[in-house]
């Protein structure tokens, strides 16, 4: 007999929380990008160049996380719907 393990409500809650986090993260990264661009006009030394490299590496990782999370959110919603249907049958 097939067995379903999971709570569709928990899956949906996590998907919503993940979406809110991704939205918040994207807003924060956008704001920080703007502030960093403006700062480039006044902060120009070797430490800034090193920081910029690290900053861009971090932004790239966050972009990859955003892409991965954006794939998982609809998957989690679909999984919750299928699980709910299964549990109600």
Where are these regions (language model features)?
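N-terminal secretion-targeting helices of virulence/extracellular proteins
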Residues: 1-89
């Amino acid at each position: 007999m097939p067995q379903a393990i999971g709570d569709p409500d928990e899956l949906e809650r996590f998907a919503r929380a993940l979406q809110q986090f991704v939205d918040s993260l994207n807003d924060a990264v956008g704001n920080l990008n703007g502030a960093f661009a403006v700062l480039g006009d006044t902060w120009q030394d070797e430490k800034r160049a090193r920081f910029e490299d690290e900053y861009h590496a971090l932004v790239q990782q966050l972009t990859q996380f955003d892409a991965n999370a954006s794939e998982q959110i609809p998957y989690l919603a679909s999984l919750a719907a299928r699980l709910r249907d299964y549990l109600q049958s």
